[in-house]
């Protein structure tokens, strides 16, 4: 009788696993055919001071808009890239763990959200960093110098598999550099925190980096205020 019960339970488990597998396949098939036009806005990040960027949610994706820089569709790790994305939208696929950070002011914010491991390349030499952790990371080889904003080492950037370049508005003095990076398939995000009129608006850019580097705790304003 005991053996019979075990056999029945085993059969039920197999059936349940089969059903789950079928359901997963159906979900995967559905996910493989996501079209950008079918995405619906489901929410927005509430910003208290920053005016130079916004983040809107679309069915699990996030649309980041930077004033005078464009729109970026953030794709979570393991999630399919939607089809028919407009040409003016740049795709960012997480994890963004090979970032080329040129804007020096961003590093301290990245440090505060414990995301320095996502910075692989620097536009500042080791002795030019005022952020001690950045200097130490370069000493240990965790962050490599890849050239300043006006003369990046394209070969190194490609060899390291760079998946995001964060620049400041100085890049507009050398637009050919931005164009070259994009031509090589590297998305370029120009941060504009210096254009915020309110001092706390500049600090609120930390929440954007929380989104980019997948620190979901910073999505709410209350959590950001605790930093």
Residue ranges, per PLM feature:
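Bacterial N-terminal signal peptides that target proteins for export
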Residues: 1-9
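Hydrophobic helical h-region of N-terminal Sec-dependent signal peptides
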Residues: 10-17
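C-terminal motif of bacterial Sec signal peptides marking the signal peptidase cleavage site
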Residues: 19-21
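Bacterial signal peptide processing site
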Residues: 23-25
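Short Lys/Arg-enriched alpha/beta "domain-start" segment
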Residues: 29-39
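A short, structured surface patch at a secondary-structure boundary
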Residues: 62-158, 164-171
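Charged, glycine-enriched surface loops/patches
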Residues: 174-214
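Conserved small/polar residues in nucleotide/adenosyl-binding loops
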Residues: 219-227
């Amino acid at each position: 009788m005991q053996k019979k019960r075990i056999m029945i339970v085993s059969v039920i488990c197999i059936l349940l696993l089969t059903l789950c597998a079928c359901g997963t396949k159906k979900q995967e098939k559905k996910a493989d055919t996501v079209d950008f036009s079918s995405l619906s806005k489901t929410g927005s990040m509430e910003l208290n001071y920053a005016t130079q960027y916004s983040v809107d949610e679309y069915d699990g994706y996030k649309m980041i808009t930077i004033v005078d820089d464009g729109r970026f569709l953030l794709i979570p790790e393991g999630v399919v890239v939607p089809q028919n994305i407009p040409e003016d939208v740049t795709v960012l696929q997480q994890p963004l763990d090979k970032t080329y950070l040129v804007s020096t002011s961003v590093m301290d914010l990245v440090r505060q959200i414990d995301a320095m491991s996502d910075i692989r390349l620097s536009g500042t030499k080791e002795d030019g960093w005022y952020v001690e952790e950045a200097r130490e990371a370069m000493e240990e080889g965790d962050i490599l110098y890849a050239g300043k904003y006006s003369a990046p080492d394209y070969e190194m950037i490609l060899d390291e598999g760079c998946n995001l370049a964060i620049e400041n508005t100085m890049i507009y003095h050398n637009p050919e550099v931005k164009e070259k990076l994009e031509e090589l398939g590297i998305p370029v995000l120009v941060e504009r925190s210096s254009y915020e009129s309110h001092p706390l608006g500049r600090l609120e850019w930390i929440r954007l980096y929380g989104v980019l580097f997948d620190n979901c705790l910073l999505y709410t304003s209350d959590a950001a205020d605790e930093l």
